[in-house]
């Protein structure tokens, strides 16, 4: 469930940033007029499970993450991006679903391996964070049971968003219900 919550928040963050991108210094009416001419962002989240390979995949077209985000938020248990200064400086007006930074912990508990493929969306570089421009380079990180750290490998992901693949431990794979996962 934590991965689904993260996907929802990633899409909500991108939607809020896309709405505000380029409108930081406009009055509300001008911002609405500008946004009505843009192609609207359409959030997409998918969850897939293959019982033969015991792979559970969460994918979204949200804000995405980069290597810095993985180091500062994903790889640290109990640290949440949505409670960070990085999030608050974006000045977004919505309440994130995930707040506790336990998503990856839950992944490490149920998976034998975990793969993160992501690319950060351009909308993170708004006027609100001109002093800390985010890299938009795609990133792929993998963790295999027994490893102490995540290993980074080359990525050629072109689309903004994140795909997380978990290779489940057999005892969790046999009891998996996508229906229960989303409700």
Task: Give the location of each predicted region.
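Conserved polar catalytic motif of the HATPase_c/GHKL fold
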Residues: 2, 6
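Conserved, well-folded catalytic cores of nucleic-acid-processing
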Residues: 7-10, 76-80, 113, 117
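ATP-lid-like helix-loop hinge signature
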Residues: 7-59, 121
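Short helix/loop capping segments that flank catalytic or ligand/cofactor-binding pockets
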Residues: 8-12, 66-68, 73, 174-177
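Hydrophobic side chains in beta-strands
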Residues: 49, 60, 82, 116-118, ...
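Glycine-rich/acidic phosphate-handling loop/turn and adjacent ATP-lid/helix
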Residues: 51-93
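GHKL-type ATPase core
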Residues: 90-183
């Amino acid at each position: 469930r934590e991965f689904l919550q993260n996907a929802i928040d990633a899409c909500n963050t991108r939607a809020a940033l896309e709405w505000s991108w380029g409108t930081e210094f406009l009055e509300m009416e001008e911002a609405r007029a500008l946004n009505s001419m843009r192609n609207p962002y359409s959030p997409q989240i998918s969850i897939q499970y293959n019982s033969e390979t015991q792979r559970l995949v969460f994918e979204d077209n949200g804000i995405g993450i980069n290597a810095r985000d993985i180091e500062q938020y994903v790889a640290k248990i109990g640290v949440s991006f949505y409670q960070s200064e990085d999030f608050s400086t974006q000045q977004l007006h919505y309440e994130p679903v995930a707040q506790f930074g336990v998503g990856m912990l839950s992944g490490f508990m149920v998976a034998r391996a975990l793969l993160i493929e992501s690319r950060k969306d351009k909308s993170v570089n708004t006027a609100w964070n001109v002093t800390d421009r985010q890299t938009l380079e795609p990133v792929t990180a993998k963790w295999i049971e027994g490893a102490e750290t995540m290993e980074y490998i080359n990525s050629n992901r072109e689309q903004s968003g994140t795909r997380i693949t978990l290779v489940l431990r057999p005892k969790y794979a046999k009891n998996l219900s996508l229906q229960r996962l989303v409700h």
